[in-house]
Every structure is written in C-alpha cells, then in structure tokens.
Swiss-Prot record:
GO-annotated biological processes: double-strand break repair involved in meiotic recombination; double-strand break repair via homologous recombination; gamete generation; homologous chromosome pairing at meiosis; male meiosis I; oocyte maturation; oogenesis; ovarian follicle development
Protein's UniProt keywords contain S-adenosyl-L-methionine: no
UniProt GO MF annotations: ATP binding; ATP hydrolysis activity; ATP-dependent DNA damage sensor activity; DNA strand exchange activity; double-stranded DNA binding; identical protein binding; single-stranded DNA binding
Protein name as catalogued: Meiotic recombination protein DMC1/LIM15 homolog
Record keywords, A-Z: ATP-binding, Cell cycle, Chromosome, DNA-binding, Meiosis, Nucleotide-binding, Nucleus
Binding-site positions, dsDNA: 230, 236, 242
Role description: Participates in meiotic recombination, specifically in homologous strand assimilation, which is required for the resolution of meiotic double-strand breaks.
Family named by the database record: Belongs to the RecA family. DMC1 subfamily.
Cellular compartments annotated: Nucleus; Chromosome
Binding of ssDNA, residues: 230, 233, 236, 242, 311
One family name in Pfam for this protein: HHH_5
C-alpha cells in the first residue's frame, strides 16, 4: 500500500514537472506557425506558462507579432494550460516541488526554513564585508550537492555586476565539501553585466538556457541587483524611470523562478537613511531599491558584522519564517557555522 502511495506521489511530481516545462513548440498543433514560435523564443519565452505570464501588450512588442497573431497565440496557450484556480490542497501538493539549497551553515539554514528556496526571490542586503558575495560563492558550490527532501543538485547561473566573482574562491569552497574543482567550475555559467539594459537582456538568455536544459539548472545568482541601476539612473529626476525598469526586471525574475522551478538569490547594497535620524536609530541605513524591490523579494535577509569573522543574519521579511537572527562565520571554505 505504501509503495503504491510513493509511486502515485512520484508520478504526481513528474506530472507537475511536465506541466512546468510544456514546450512552446506544442503551439504548432493549434495552428501557430514555427516562424512565430521562433520570434517568441528570441525574447526568452520558451514555455506555454511563459506565454500565460506575458501580457498581450508585451507580446505585441515582439517584432513581427500583430495583435491578431497575439490573440491567436493566447487562445492556443489557454487550450494547453489548466484553468487558473486550484484548491489549497492541490496547491500544497504542487508546493512539494519546492526545494531548498543549503547556505553552508546549519544555523543560517534553520533561520530560512531549510535554505534558499526555489520558486522565490531571496534577497540578502548589508554593508560591505557582511558576507553577501561570500554567500553567493558558497551557494555556487552547495547548489551542486545533493540535499534534503530528494534534492539532487544542479547547475548555476551567476550574473556579476560588480566584478566580484572569483573562480579560485569556488576551488577553496569545493575543497571543504570534497568536490572536484573542475566539475564545480564547469557547472557554473558566468556572465558579466555592464549596464542595467545588459542585465535585463541577459535574463532572456537565462530563460532560454533554463528551457534548453530543463530541470538541470537550480539557481540564479545576481550580485548585486541594484549596482548598475544606481550608475545608469542618477538623481531624483531619473528615479521614476529607474524604478519602472527595476520593476520590469524583478517581474521577469519572479516569472523565471516559477516557470522553471529555480531559486533566485540576489544581493543588495545599503544607503544612508536621513529620515531615520528622527527615530533615534544608532546607524540609520536602509537597502536600496525602495518599495518595488521590497515587495518583489519573497524573503529578505539583513546581514551585519559581528566579532571578527562572525556575521549576523536577520529575517527582515518572509511570508512564512518569523523575524529571527542567526550567527554564522566566513571561513576559508565559505559560509559555515560559528564556533562557540
């Protein structure tokens, strides 16, 4: 009886995986020609769910797609995908696909409810030297290792906006986990973004890559999310445009994480908060990106310095974990538990 139950659960999981990666080529059976399908793929829309996640207006902006064609594509996609409503029980079953990637520290994992979650954006912010980039490098290795709940490990895409990625650091962390250096480095796809526009364009490539190797990639890292936006849009006059572009990019990230069941981890910087002096805070600083980034991130983690190599992580915002703190250490082998 139990074996039957396990088989049913596994087949249910596979059904969910298949519905997640329904290829856009299926539209051919519903009268959409291959030329139009290629146009959709060129902008990173590679799955039926991807069409559902894109507005008609955005589809009309794709070169060569008229309003009539877009309407036809939407109708065809709706025939292939299930209706929008599920019971809470059905949704909880679907949530079983969610996996967690360990941070390298048991205390930190406990704080996050198991680690960095898939189908979600996890943001870590803090001043310089609080461990943001070290955490990014550690996740590049731990995401490749088998974990709890049947997680088998996978590949990573790392988008670097500040030229802080160091392959040698991955070798040191790989030594700690007894993993082959070459294998670890081969499983990390690296891209350097130079402008906020370039950063957005790279996400089209990311979506195409996730689709091409469906289920192989497990983690997308952007270190750091706001650095290029700060440079490209300066002063209050450009703030509205910056926030609009940022909102579009974050919406794209959210959709990618859900469409391909990957974890998205982003780091963020801090800025002085002049208004907070009235609240008598000792060190008034806040993460940049404003309300748009605050609402887009599923889980927000605040990092601050402790004694020596110790760092303190605090849940700043989370839909399921309580506001709490954990102490971790930055070691030669990446993020680890603090020694008592």
């Amino acid at each position: 009886m139990k074996e039957d139950q396990v088989v049913q659960e596994e087949s249910g999981f596979q059904d969910d995986e298949e519905s997640l990666f329904q290829d856009i080529d299926l539209l051919q059976k519903h009268g959409i020609n291959m030329a139009d399908i290629k146009k959709l793929k060129s902008v990173g829309i590679c799955t039926i769910k991807g069409i559902q996640m894109t507005t008609r207006r955005a589809l009309c902006n794709v070169k060569g797609l008229s309003e009539a064609k877009v309407e036809k594509i939407k109708e065809a996609a709706n025939k292939l995908i299930e209706p929008g409503f599920l019971t809470a029980f059905q949704y909880s079953e679907r949530r079983k696909m969610v996996f967690h990637i360990t941070t390298g520290s048991q205390e930190f994992d406990k704080l996050l409810g198991g680690g960095i979650e898939s189908m979600a954006i996890t943001e870590a912010f803090g001043e310089f030297r609080t461990g943001k980039t070290q955490l990014s490098h550690t996740l590049c290795v731990t995401a490749q290792l088998p974990g709890t709940g049947g997680y088998s490990g996978g590949k990573i895409i790392f988008i670097d906006t500040e030229n802080t990625f160091r392959p040698d650091r991955l070798r040191d962390i790989a030594d700690r986990f007894n993993v082959d250096h070459e294998a670890v480095l081969d499983n990390v796809l690296y891209a350097r973004a130079y402008t906020s526009e370039h950063q957005m364009e790279l996400l089209d490539y990311v979506a195409a890559k996730f689709h091409e190797e469906a289920g192989i990639f497990k983690l997308l890292i952007i270190d750091s999310i706001m650095a290029l936006f700060r440079v490209d849009f300066s002063g209050r006059g450009e703030l509205a445009e910056r926030q609009q572009k940022l909102a579009q990019m974050l919406s794209r990230l959210q959709k990618i994480s859900e469409e391909y069941n990957v974890a998205v981890f982003v780091t963020n910087q801090m800025t002085a908060d002049p208004g907070a002096t009235m609240t008598f805070q000792a060190d008034p600083k806040k993460p940049i990106g404003g309300h748009i980034l605050a609402h887009a991130s599923t889980t927000r983690i605040s990092l601050r310095k402790g004694r020596g190599e110790l760092r303190i992580a605090k849940i700043y915002d989370s839909p399921e974990m309580p506001e709490n703190e954990a102490t971790f250490a930055i070691t030669a082998g990446g993020i680890g538990d603090a020694k008592e």
